[in-house]
């Protein structure tokens, strides 16, 4: 049976109106996304009063970061016909679920590890076309293949942007009309969940709103976070920098041999001298996933194409603990998989996305300027 491609919506107008268009167009997926994460709080024993109090605390943090984000979420909620709290939950699910688990006496912290992911950037000097190529495999719950979407936002106050995101979310990975692109990977350290901070998805959204690469870097490097995360930034001007972020500090990693490759373990020697790596029990295969991608890219030659990056991301070494992860039981009994493969060309404003790539090799090309096109199988 053919796997459904991710639906696309293009929105414009003021924040609330953009959100309303989004929620209306993708009502069923937004509801499914809300149910997926709301169910987790139910399983942790949260009644409606406790759930609302927990989510409102994060809404306050988001509003301080940017009130327009809350306006857009209100529009999504109204368009989809779901409570506002549910949309906040989608956008702060990492932080909300982690806080709920810490408050639940009987919760196993390994029940719901965060996103996996393997990301890479091919710089201009290694690119066959002379243009940056930026991509990622997103590893998470297999059912998110049925809740994720591609969103295009037409803005009057900054660059348009394109993002692959869970329905109801404001951003995950993506690129904008100024040539800035971002992907992000799960990291964990002993500094996590000790301070208030901005939900990670909102920081990624902030990046996509920036006209200048320097301001995108500032959003990543200086915004306080609740938890660690790796954020990989690139620009159509030819540069990429990876930031391994602790909640209160960021550690840059620069390209080597025209490449940046990152999985889910800390690499910065400075970071490792200052904090403790705590995420490996959830993602032990991270230690070879980035090595495999780099090796395959180097073997492909001195000049690389989008097809070379796709081929590296389709790697099955160590399956099912591979770069391209087939659906397999996760630690909580749910199915875990590479939900999507995303390949971006920031200079062209295009993003090619394949759902469940271990089972499917059909990509759809999404664009800042054109309608989506389904491509021939890779």
Spans of features found by a protein language model:
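Short, well-ordered beta-strand elements within core beta-sheets of diverse protein domains
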Residues: 203-208
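C-terminus-biased signal that marks the final domain/tail of proteins
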Residues: 1-116, 209-252, 256-378
